Design a protein with these regions (language model features):
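Oxidoreductase cofactor-interface core, primarily capturing Rossmann-like NAD(P)-dependent enzymes
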Residues: 1-147
Length: 147
């Protein structure tokens, strides 16, 4: 489990723990990205989930949108139900098929989904559909891409 926004070194989460001059500890998303990159290079199978902001709402009520490389940071609403993240974790355990993958996820109101599809699919189906795209995060991007 990680966070959306790991590609932006100026993300506000990187400022937590720093003083007004930028000194001190911090850079939580940069450290998360470094850990992800280390895992990817380890040769172990993995699934890395980058949820948007976690909210305490009912799960399975919104369309799950999965993509990579902070594309979803451009969305106006960048949150997801904690329960939906749990369901995606379970789906990753049961549906990954020995494949390593890293993705971002948010929940979207049904009427806001492009194409007008008002169906809400399960986390398992959303994950399977995402896997069929062949996408995964590009770990050459971001503040640690050249290290």
């Amino acid at each position: 489990m990680s966070s959306m926004g790991v590609l932006d070194p100026n993300n506000f989460l990187n400022q937590i723990g720093k003083d007004k001059f930028g000194n001190g500890h911090g850079d939580i998303l940069i450290w998360k990205r470094k850990a992800e990159k280390y895992l990817c290079l380890s040769g172990l199978q993995y699934t890395i989930i980058h949820p948007g902001g976690l909210v305490d709402t009912d799960s399975s009520k919104q369309e799950l949108v999965l993509d990579v490389d902070d594309v979803l940071m451009k969305m106006e609403k960048k949150s997801i139900s904690r329960g939906d993240v749990v369901n995606l974790c379970i789906a990753a355990l049961t549906e990954s098929g020995n494949r390593s993958v890293s993705f971002d996820c948010i929940g979207k109101q049904r009427d806001a989904v492009e194409g007008g599809d008002s169906s809400v699919v399960s986390a398992e189906e959303a994950f399977r559909l995402f896997l069929s795209t062949g996408k995964t995060a590009d770990y050459t991007l971001g503040p640690t891409g050249s290290e």
